[in-house]
Swiss-Prot record:
<dbReference type="GO" id="GO:0047304">
    <property type="term" value="F:2-aminoethylphosphonate-pyruvate transaminase activity"/>
</dbReference>
<dbReference type="InterPro" id="IPR015424">
    <property type="entry name" value="PyrdxlP-dep_Trfase"/>
</dbReference>
<keyword id="KW-0032">Aminotransferase</keyword>
<dbReference type="InterPro" id="IPR015422">
    <property type="entry name" value="PyrdxlP-dep_Trfase_small"/>
</dbReference>
<dbReference type="InterPro" id="IPR012703">
    <property type="entry name" value="NH2EtPonate_pyrv_transaminase"/>
</dbReference>
<dbReference type="InterPro" id="IPR015421">
    <property type="entry name" value="PyrdxlP-dep_Trfase_major"/>
</dbReference>
<keyword id="KW-0670">Pyruvate</keyword>
<dbReference type="InterPro" id="IPR024169">
    <property type="entry name" value="SP_NH2Trfase/AEP_transaminase"/>
</dbReference>
<feature type="modified residue" description="N6-(pyridoxal phosphate)lysine">
    <location>
        <position position="193"/>
    </location>
</feature>
<comment type="similarity">
    <text>Belongs to the class-V pyridoxal-phosphate-dependent aminotransferase family. PhnW subfamily.</text>
</comment>
<dbReference type="InterPro" id="IPR000192">
    <property type="entry name" value="Aminotrans_V_dom"/>
</dbReference>
<keyword id="KW-0808">Transferase</keyword>
<dbReference type="GO" id="GO:0019700">
    <property type="term" value="P:organic phosphonate catabolic process"/>
</dbReference>
<dbReference type="Pfam" id="PF00266">
    <property type="entry name" value="Aminotran_5"/>
</dbReference>
<protein>
    <recommendedName>
        <fullName>2-aminoethylphosphonate--pyruvate transaminase</fullName>
        <ecNumber>2.6.1.37</ecNumber>
    </recommendedName>
</protein>
<comment type="subunit">
    <text>Homodimer.</text>
</comment>
<comment type="function">
    <text>Involved in phosphonate degradation.</text>
</comment>
Length: 367
């Protein structure tokens, strides 16, 4: 079945027809053909995508990507631990909110939504507060499309002996990284992002020695990261509680299609071409990106809304959807913006068609 429109969003996103077709079969969660032949293969493939080094493992968690973030924050940090988190958008702020809900002491570094973190501020905080045990940062902050400097951030954190948590929700699978080389201890992502699967579960790729330290520390039963991992390890892919079987099978297919495309490097190149084509086309129509070009990610781009008094996002959105494209509203607190994603089953030719559709949808310029 063909889609009626293209989702130009940061996830859920447009998937291939073959990924959707993979969900047409039912699976028994007790069978080896599901646990060993699908779940365990997924776990192995994820680790290989994340690093070429040994010592890492992966665990899948039911729910949204945020559930996997909460599972990590709530399991990795001991009762006497403290978190430092970079908040330069809604998703960094969400990590701080999770820590607050779980009564985990948290130091927040807030450079603002359109700025990268100042590493000297992070350095000062870590040097002056030995109680901080863990640090967390979002790789691609989809509030704006900002790509944060994770290599430099992790280097500072490791120089102070901290455990590093990376929210790579909207970047893993679309931007090449080696988490072992960067010194990342826990990396979190989701099925419905750059791997191009569908919603239903997230996953954590972790240094096994750090994951094993999580035993007995979880602040939630269903979000116990260690217990979920241990169950999968001992029972060859078995989940503790009901697994989203159709989503898992679709994700397996999506991983195969990532390999067929040429891996993360090839997908990154496609996303980057999409983004550059988008920005050039939007500028030709008079739109300007929120961020400076050097801060852009290939994942999603924020654009300033037109200042014309007749412009309304909902009307603009509706006109685009009628032409087969769905975009995202803005999420920045101090600027009127909208966002356009470049990921999913989307190609440069689609972006070129989008630019034509946007030109037709600019009703406020009609005389």
């Amino acid at each position: 079945m063909k889609n009626e429109y293209l989702l130009l969003t940061p996830g859920p996103l447009s998937t291939s027809e073959t990924v959707r077709e993979a969900m047409l079969k039912d699976w028994c969660t007790w069978d080896d053909e599901y646990n060993k032949d699908i779940v365990e293969v997924i776990r192995t493939k994820l680790v290989k995508l994340a690093t070429q080094q040994d010592g890492y493992t992966s665990v899948l968690m039911q729910g949204s990507g945020t559930a996997s973030v909460e599972a990590t924050i709530g399991s990795a940090i001991a009762k006497e631990g403290k978190l430092l988190v970079v908040d330069n958008g809604a998703y960094g702020a969400r990590i701080a909110q999770i820590a607050d809900y779980l009564n985990i002491p948290c130091h927040v570094v807030s450079p603002g939504e359109t700025s990268q973190p100042h590493l000297n501020e992070v350095e000062t905080a870590l040097a002056s507060d030995p109680a901080i045990t863990h640090v967390a940062i979002v790789h691609c902050e989809t509030t704006t499309g900002m790509l944060n400097p994770i290599e430099a951030f992790a280097s500072v954190a490791k120089a102070h002996g901290k455990v590093v948590i990376l929210d790579a929700m909207s970047s893993f699978g679309g931007i090449p990284i080696d988490i072992a080389e960067l010194g990342i201890d826990f990396m979190i992502s989701s099925a419905n992002k750059c791997i191009q699967g569908v919603p239903g579960f997230g996953f954590v790729i972790a240094k096994q020695t750090e994951l094993e330290k999580c035993q007995g520390q979880a602040r939630s039963l269903s979000l116990d990261l260690y217990d979920q991992w241990h169950c999968m390890e001992v029972n060859h892919g078995k989940w503790r509680f009901t697994s989203p079987t159709h989503t898992v099978r679709a994700f397996y297919q999506a991983l195969l299609e990532l390999e067929q495309e040429g891996g993360i490097e090839a997908r990154h190149n496609r996303y980057q071409t999409n983004q550059k084509t988008l920005v050039a086309g939007m500028r030709s129509l008079g739109f300007e990106p929120l961020l400076n070009d050097e801060l852009h990610s290939p994942i999603i781009t924020s654009f300033y809304s037109p200042t014309h008094s007749d412009y309304q996002f909902k009307a603009f959105y509706t006109r685009l959807k009628e032409q087969g494209f769905v975009i995202y509203p803005g999420k920045v607190s101090n600027a009127d913006c909208f966002r356009i994603g470049n990921i999913g089953e989307v190609y440069p030719a689609d972006i070129e068609r989008l630019i034509g559709a946007i030109e037709k949808a600019m009703y406020w310029q009609v005389a």
